Every structure is written in structure tokens, then in C-alpha cells.
Amino acid sequence: MQYPTIDATLVAEQDFRISQSFVLRGQAPEGSFLAVLESDGETGYFYALDSSRGQPFQDGCLIWNQESAEDKHYTAKIYWNKDSTKALLTINDFPNAIFDFGRRSGCCRTGYPPQLGPTWSPNGHEWQEAMLADFLPPTPWETLAEKLEELCSIDARFENTDPILIVETCPSAFLG
């Protein structure tokens, strides 16, 4: 799947190789949140930190290990959404992990770890495509989708992507 251009604030970027140790820090433009990509040369983890707390570590996701990734040139980027509550990690412009500080939830392509604790990501770190929405530009259907959502019941599901808008609904919702 090819993703459109990311519509968010780029705060950190680094070229690297899997076998290289490094730390890439991406401070939120506003507030106390920080997203960090750290590699020890064998594994790469993406961390959610909140410097306003006594224990800043909030959550973490495995991004790669040496066995699962080719040791070649990559570019990592950390983005923040408009209200500085969600961080996105891309590698070679492909979304790999997202932290939502408001919902206390994280997801990544590896889905690992299943869960770190009860306060963040209680359902684990499986990839959630919907979490990417805050980092993508508006689709051509944005206004139409908003109007349709107002008209449809809670039984409707919308998939608002470019180039298509999919609306699934239960016919009984319109009969009741």
C-alpha cells in the first residue's frame, strides 16, 4: 500500500543502518510529550515519554530486530500531529508506529509487545490503520463524509480514503 504525503510536523530525521546504535528524539512542538526511536545495533524500539511525569516512560513498541530486517540504508522520521498529542514514526516514508498520548494507546507493524502494562495500550500494539488518519491530508470526500456521518446511524461504517469513500450501513437503520 502506498501512503499519501504525511500532513504533520516533522520534528526529527536520521539516516541509519540496522546494525548501527543511535537515538532519535522527536519532541512534540507543544507540551511535554516526546517520542524516541532507539537502536542498540540489534533491535529498534519506539518509545512514548512524558517529561511532566515522575516516571516519563509511558509505552514502547518493537520496530525491528536484526533477524527481521536487512542491514541497509534507511531514513527514520518522527512526526507530530497538529495538536501535539500523536506521534508517528516512518521508516523510508512508510508508517511503522503511532502513539496517541490522549488515548494512551500505541500501535506498530510488528504488534510487539502484546502489552506492557494496564495503563497504556491495554489491548496490545497491533497495527491500527485508523490511527494514521490524523497524519494524512484531507481526502476529496472529507466534506461529503462528514455530512453522511451526520445522516447515518451508529450502524454505519465509513472508510474515507483517497481515491474512494466506502459507506457500509444497515438498511434497518433507515427504517426505524
Regions found by a protein language model. Give the residues of each.
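Loop/turn residues immediately N-terminal
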Residues: 94-96
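Acidic, proline/glycine-rich low-complexity IDRs
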Residues: 99-176
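Surface-exposed loop/turn elements that mediate protein-protein interactions on large endomembrane-trafficking
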Residues: 3, 46-68, 98-118
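Short, well-structured hydrophobic secondary-structure segments
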Residues: 24-71, 77-79
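Blade-terminus and WD-like Trp-Asp/Gly-His loop motifs, strongest in beta-propeller folds
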Residues: 12-31, 38-40, 79-84, 121-139
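Long, intrinsically disordered, low-complexity acidic/Ser/Thr/Pro-rich regions
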Residues: 2-23, 152, 163
